[in-house]
Amino acid sequence: MRFPTPLIPATLIKRYKRFLADCRLEDGREITAHCANPGSMMGLAEPGMRVWLEPNDDPKKKLKYGWRLVEHTNGHFTGVDTSVPNRALKAALEAHEIAEFAAYSEVQAEVKYGQNSRIDFLLTDAKLPRCYVEVKSVTLSRQPGLAEFPDSVTARGTKHLRELAAMAEAGHRAVMLYLVQRTDCDRFALAADIDPAYAAEFETAHAKGVERLVIGTTITPEGVKIGDILPS
């Protein structure tokens, strides 16, 4: 998935109110960018970090920049826009690029199911059981090479696990897919110390048949590409 508009570099001044970030452009101007990430963004919102923004000229949007990436001092990137994983995965699923799902002929996004929820992707094929895929963006890393989820308590994520488990018990295929939006991680673990309830609910869901799939990404200022399956 390529970014529709070329990204521009900037320096983060501060993130606040979760969805706002003040940044300094290379020409010295200070602007406010939209931060499409409701999480804590632990380790990703320190003043002085190099970030990449996507400009827009949409008259309906008050903020003319969207925060897309963090560039670390080691040259690696982290994607901070939580809408990117679904867009990148939709393209990969439709192109049958993910082996675990390649046999499914139809991909539907945001389908109603469960308790007033929407599943990220419903995969169907006449010869296969329905496959419900819930996607989580993974950006936390507290140890070199190890990506973790979640970065804050997520009651919503716990609810999604219960709903996936119900689909598995009903005879459908149910997959919890963690997309690692970091290029410096090759392993994954649940951050049970941050949200023990989520970790416990995952074990319950897994015992009921919910699969866990962790996929890496290749990230540059040009775009995000779905990568390899990572150990977890």
Swiss-Prot record:
InterPro entries: SfsA, SfsA_C, SfsA_N. Gene3D superfamilies: 2.40.50.580, 3.40.1350.60. Disulfide bonds: none annotated. GO terms for molecular function: DNA binding. It comes from the Bacteria. PANTHER family: SUGAR FERMENTATION STIMULATION PROTEIN A (PTHR30545:SF2). Belongs to the SfsA family. NCBIfam families: sfsA. HAMAP family: SfsA (MF_00095). This is Sugar fermentation stimulation protein homolog. It comes from Ruegeria sp. (strain TM1040).
